[in-house]
Amino acid sequence: VLSLSLGVRIGLKSKELLKLGQAALLHDIGMINIPHEILKKETLLTEDEWEMIKTHPLNGVKITMDLMGLSEESAQILLAILEHQKSYDGSGYPEYIKNSKISLFARIIQIADFYDAVTTPKFHNLVPMSPAEAIAYLVKHSGKLFDPLLSKHFINLLGIYPLGTLVFLTSGEWALVIGQPQDPDKLHKPVVLIIKDANGVDIPQKLVDLSQSEIDIVRADSPWKYGIDPAEYLI
């Protein structure tokens, strides 16, 4: 979804969006060859385990070629699967790829995959970043790890406080960001769902558009640190 949203944001046509969507769905298919105990390991990987993880892009290409064959239509998808762990500056893996410029689809998927991985409790990610922390990391490493233009579009797409961010308000209440303001000059004032009082006790939920309120955000944090699953409130 994030990859497609970014593709729409930069103006890709429907045919390209279809291929981008396929690439995004299949980019980690090579993980099926990685032992389950490694994928679900909750401690740091050993060097050998990490080397096994790094085989998944090439494994993914092989699996996808068996499914789709090699053609002009599948070439972009296969290249994205192969390159999605490469960074904008050429670092990352597979190490043998020395292209100075990573393919567009791979650069899009890399950003979306990074954001999803660090903000969601998954294997090897014991303390997820808050959405705001992930955005700050994107900003800091834009032009190095991440395509700077795509990063800018992605950040504008999500807003300063992306959906699911836990925010602490000047009222003392806790809230989750559930929407972005219509006014682009008020990205610091999103729509929030107040869920707890100043003591962290559940209260009747209240929807507040901060762009229309005198209440401000004091700070943002990861909801997972406080045992809050945003999906319970956003779905």
Model-assigned labels for residue ranges:
Residues 1-235:
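Histidine- and acidic-residue-rich, metal-dependent catalytic cores
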